């Protein structure tokens, strides 16, 4: 069976989106299926129309050049047109049995055009509602024109594809509330391959010395620094934690839109000796940094996005036998059963975060 995956972006870029995609492709290939892959013009850094990475071949879509295509709203349709044009080029060559389009809805809409044109069944995988992420990133306003159009477009896609998959019950409930039959929606949860992680391994002492973490109790966060992750809240909780545990240290690994804000906040609070900020690190080194941490903290703020969507990072920490503390937003509550596989604290409350850390220690 030949499956053509229609993606926003892909490896070699590093993101939760690309890692989940890669895992899906690997598992489908283990089933003996042939997978093919195309990315939209939103993929960054393409150097050729066809690229190979990690044993996978990716067809890249052209980036729209016209100044007209840079206008708000119009630029989104330019992405769809570019993707449809590239699909028209490769469909006759690949002759896929199934189209598997992945969020966002722009991919789903382009795939829907092609599915009807070539009479190919279409599965749409919804990983999050991108209009909600856009609100957090500051590129859309909740209830604004772009927000409304994005939601309407994805609802249209939901209604017309052959089948829908999504990553959690929160998303399935929301999709069903739009009049989509529940039997059309399958939840395929976020997961990690435990064979790719080590369990309960001691921290590398050379790295501990380098980071200044020897004989310290280490809180940690490894991931992208988006506003909804709530990292400033974690910083606000540190002084109270330090009154009981002056040996505490916070290891922050990653980067993102809030990186400079977080660095400045660390400086303003005088926490340079407490917070170890590594920036982004090579993917193959991440395991060594996981092993440095005693408690992973995921202080996501309460909002529509975090209440609906389950994250991947807490599962990675669990797979390595690490303690997990997370805010009680809906996405976390779907993953974490208190005192069974983690701990929860009241979202948006730095005092409760600090109290829970102290109680755990």
Task: Locate each region found by the language model.
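N-terminal subdomain of nucleotide-sugar transferases
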Residues: 1-57, 61-62, 241
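Short hydrophobic beta-strand element within catalytic cores of glycosyltransferases
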Residues: 298, 316-319, 323-326
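Nucleotide-activated donor-binding/catalytic signature segment of Leloir-type glycosyltransferases, i.e.
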Residues: 253, 260-287
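Short alpha-helical donor nucleotide-sugar binding micro-motif in glycosyltransferases
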Residues: 91, 158, 280-281, 288-293
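Conserved donor-binding/catalytic core segment of Leloir-type glycosyltransferases
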Residues: 4, 213-238
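Conserved acidic donor-binding segment of nucleotide-sugar-dependent glycosyltransferases
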Residues: 338-339, 343-350, 359-361
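Carbohydrate-associated surface elements
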Residues: 170, 191
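A short helix/loop element that forms part of the nucleotide-sugar donor recognition site in Leloir-type
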Residues: 49-50, 198-213
């Amino acid at each position: 069976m030949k499956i053509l995956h229609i993606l926003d972006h892909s490896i070699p870029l590093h993101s939760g989106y690309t890692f989940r995609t890669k895992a899906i492709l690997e598992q489908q290939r283990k089933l003996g299926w042939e997978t093919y892959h195309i990315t939209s013009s939103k993929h960054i850094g393409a150097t050729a129309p066809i690229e190979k990475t990690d044993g996978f071949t990716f067809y890249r879509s052209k980036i729209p050049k016209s100044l007209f295509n840079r206008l708000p709203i119009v630029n989104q349709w330019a992405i769809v047109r570019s993707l449809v044009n590239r699909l028209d080029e490769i469909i006759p060559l690949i002759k896929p049995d199934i189209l598997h389009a992945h969020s966002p809805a722009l991919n789903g809409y382009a795939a829907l055009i092609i599915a009807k044109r070539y009479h190919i069944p279409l599965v749409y995988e919804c990983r999050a509602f991108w209009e909600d992420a856009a609100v957090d990133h500051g590129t859309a306003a909740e209830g604004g024109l772009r927000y409304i159009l994005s939601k309407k477009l994805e609802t249209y896609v939901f209604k017309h594809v052959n089948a829908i998959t999504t990553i959690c019950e929160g998303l399935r409930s929301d999709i069903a509330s739009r009049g989509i039959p529940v039997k059309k929606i399958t939840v395929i949860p976020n997961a990690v391959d435990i064979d790719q992680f080590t369990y309960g391994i001691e921290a590398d002492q050379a790295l501990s010395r380098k980071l200044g973490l020897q004989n310290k109790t280490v809180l940690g966060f490894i991931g992208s620094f988006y506003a909804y992750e709530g990292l400033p809240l974690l910083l606000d909780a540190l002084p109270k934690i330090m009154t009981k545990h002056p040996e505490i240290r916070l290891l922050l690994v990653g980067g993102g839109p809030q990186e400079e804000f977080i660095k400045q906040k660390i400086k303003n609070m005088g926490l340079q000796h407490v917070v170890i900020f590594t920036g982004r690190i090579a993917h193959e080194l991440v395991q060594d940094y996981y092993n440095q941490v005693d408690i992973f903290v995921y202080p996501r703020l309460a909002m529509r996005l975090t209440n609906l969507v389950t994250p991947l990072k807490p599962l990675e920490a669990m797979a390595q036998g690490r303690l997990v503390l997370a805010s009680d937003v809906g996405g976390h509550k779907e993953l974490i059963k208190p005192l069974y596989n983690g701990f929860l604290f009241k979202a948006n409350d730095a005092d409760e975060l600090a109290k829970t850390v102290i109680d755990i220690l």
